[in-house]
Amino acid sequence: MKKTLATLFLLTCLGSSSAYADNALILQTDFSLKDGAVSAMKGVAFGVDHNLKIFDLTHEIPPYNIWEGAYRLYQTASYWPQGSVFVSVVDPGVGTDRKSVVLKTKSGQYFVSPDNGTLTLVAQTLGIDSVREIDEKANRLKGSEKSYTFHGRDVYAYTGARLASGAITFEQVGPELPAKVVELSYQKAKATKGEVKGNIPILDIQYGNVWSNISDELLNQAEIKLNDTLCVTISEGSQQKYAGKMPYVASFGDVPEGQPMVYLNSLLNVSVALNMDNFAQKHQVASGADWNIDVKKCAK
């Protein structure tokens, strides 16, 4: 009897821990908050389960910018627990024959999205466990069948909420697909002695800092160390946009105000900034799959 009660207690504890993670629904869109689109999505999710925990990742993705949507998922996903469900709606192809999918990562999170490149970076960094196509006959908001332009509300928020609340299992999302997604092409980060190259996936928008996909591990492989003077080149495609020298430092206050610097951002990736100024604005630098950066030790 005591053993049975102990087992039930343990299962209850495990169940409530799992339920908390499974009930996390995280929304990302390019809708902004200027109108009622995001509220409609939340209303649909709340209608599925009044106890659902709904969070916002961001709704300020620039319109149609699939690449930035991909990066924001990568930036945040690893900090959310197993069982969390992300709904990402950056969908310029809404209403076309592009697939609507749910990707389960090897770390146990779920991503509900059009298969249009949005899942590129989470697939590459967290790994793909499996992918399922959303069966819209089973997983679509009732009464929305005539709507072709708001799948974020009618399909993605609805399916994400059903999955997060436990109303459906992952297997009930729809048929399993090959374990791959549409991937955007970009410059993969790489290192050689004294030099690293990579992509500029995003800007630290508030401050104008330039973030790369070059990890601190690659910097170590290149034998680049704190206080080295580095030559930095930034290009858009084949067109050079910036070239200059700057120190590699730990933080902003290590250089005078207005001076350039290389540092590691909060994701431990190589970044470029001006202390208390806007590097991207001053040098007309942007981000995306076509924006690349080269950082190397300057010749003495």
Which residue ranges define each predicted feature?
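Mid-to-C-terminal functional-domain signal that highlights helix-capping/loop sites
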Residues: H283, N292-I293
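N-terminal glycine-rich anion-binding loop in soluble enzyme alpha/beta folds
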Residues: D22-E60
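A conserved acidic, glycine/proline-rich C-terminal tail/linker
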Residues: V210-Q284
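Anionic-ligand-binding alpha/beta catalytic cores of soluble enzymes and soluble regulatory domains
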Residues: S144-L226
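Active-site histidine-anchored catalytic micro-motif
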Residues: A24, G36, V48-I54, N65-Y71, ...
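Sec-dependent N-terminal signal peptides
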Residues: T4-L14
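Sec/Tat signal peptide C-region and signal peptidase I cleavage site
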Residues: S17-A21
